Amino acid sequence: MTPTVASTVVDRPAAEVFSYTTDPTHFPEWQQGLVDGHLEPAGPAQVGSKCVTTRRIGGANRAVTSVLTHIDAPRAWGVRGIDGPVRATVDVTVEPLTETSSRLTIAVDFDGHGIGKLLVPLIVRRQAEKEMPANVEALKRRVEAQ
């Protein structure tokens, strides 16, 4: 299917935008419903690192693991979900516009497994389409406030 895409111009250099956007410990600061994020193993991100995020769903915390599929700092970063009924593929691109501003684009797509095959088209895609613009604007505000 077609990914859900949100984009904005951030008044910060590409390296700053990339660093903040791709640090899982910052994810709860700008993603609705996310309560925790971290890399395994801890340390600098590299292809194959696991990105573990915990989201509040239906009154319970649910952890999901993704694997880092590509990284080209400060331009591109991507993860692919490897567990759970709904697995996201996320691609982040940061395009420098000037020395002090960048275009940030985040694309998210979903693959359903088991019950997730029903959830993705009925709930998950619609929720992502609703949340992504607000999430990206929250991220923009956070980065620009630093």
Regions inferred by a protein language model and the residue ranges of each:
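Generic structural detector for well-ordered beta-strands
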Residues: 7-11, 38, 67, 93, ...
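A short, compositionally biased micro-patch
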Residues: 30, 71-72, 97
